[in-house]
């Protein structure tokens, strides 16, 4: 059952980004409504990843504004943007190669934990129950992405296409309001999105 397209959830207005004398983005505007799918399409070097990096708080544009759910931000870091409900995948993978698929996807749940890091590390008190609930959420994502057979495999041992699915799983684990996908299907022969 498809959901009805809703109100504007992300509004990007007049974004310009320069690196020294090189213009990466010039006066870019668009919006995304709730339950809507949008694509930024262009050749290599057109600035697609730079645009996502501006929305995600990795880059700070010199001009323009980004409004998410009615809150305009210009100088927010990636963590603040994630706390607002924006998640993303990366063109160049940024996974923990020595950690398992399950543990990599669990990192996407980090902001959802209420207990302190110390309580989590000790599995003490409510932290143990909380981790069980977070793992159940991640297990549903692993099932959805059809990567059950690789659950305990270190990510560095997986082919690129499967690593892209793990990256998507980590972003989905954040349970985001907006999901930014940078080259989501690169290296994957099976469509999962």
Regions found by a protein language model. Give the residues of each.
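Conserved structural motif at the start of ABC-family nucleotide-binding domains
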Residues: 10-12, 25
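Conserved ABC transporter NBD signature motif
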Residues: 64-73, 83-84
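Helix-to-loop junction immediately C-terminal to a conserved catalytic motif
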Residues: 56
